[in-house]
Every structure is written in structure tokens, then in C-alpha cells.
Amino acid sequence: MPKRVLQGVVISDKSDKTVVVKVERRYSHPLLKKTVRQSKNYKAHDENNQFKIGDQVSIQESRPISKDKCWIVVKDNVA
């Protein structure tokens, strides 16, 4: 089974080797027929502490690294 890859924005880099990435998804509400935005925060592993707040990144699913962390930052999305 392929590992999921999500795109988001780094919103916190205070922890050592960890960043918090906000991932936003949009979908059409079935009853209201309106586009709804929903966001979720993921803790991701950043081995070299190279990503800062505001960076666009891609995260990939991985084995559990800690209690809350099972994603790895794979690349920086340069706009």
C-alpha cells in the first residue's frame, strides 16, 4: 500500500527535530452544496531542523517515531 503524501504549511518549529504542519482540505458539503475548508495539524519529523515557520512542505506517512509523530517531512515545496 503506498504511503500517503500531504502538502501543508509549517506553523511551529519550537521542538527539536519536529515541526507542526497545518494541512488544509477542501470538499463540497453534500447538503449545503458549499465548499468547506477543514484543517488538521500533524507533527512531522525534521531530522536537520531545516524547516521554519511559513515554509510550504510535503509530509509522508511513516512508522511511528514517537507517541504523536508518524509523519516525515520529505521535501520543501518552492512556490
From Swiss-Prot:
The keyword rRNA-binding applies. PROSITE patterns: RIBOSOMAL_S17. GO terms for biological process: translation. One of its GO terms (molecular function) is rRNA binding. Pfam families: Ribosomal_S17. It comes from the Bacteria. Keywords: Ribonucleoprotein, Ribosomal protein, RNA-binding, rRNA-binding. One of its GO terms (cellular component) is cytosolic small ribosomal subunit. CDD domains: Ribosomal_uS17. Transmembrane segments: none annotated. HAMAP family: Ribosomal_uS17_B. Part of the 30S ribosomal subunit. Belongs to the universal ribosomal protein uS17 family. NCBIfam families: PRK05610.1 (NF004123), uS17_bact (TIGR03635). One of the primary rRNA binding proteins, it binds specifically to the 5'-end of 16S ribosomal RNA. This is Small ribosomal subunit protein uS17. It comes from Bartonella tribocorum (strain CIP 105476 / IBS 506). The lineage of its organism: Bacteria, Pseudomonadati, Pseudomonadota, Alphaproteobacteria, Hyphomicrobiales.
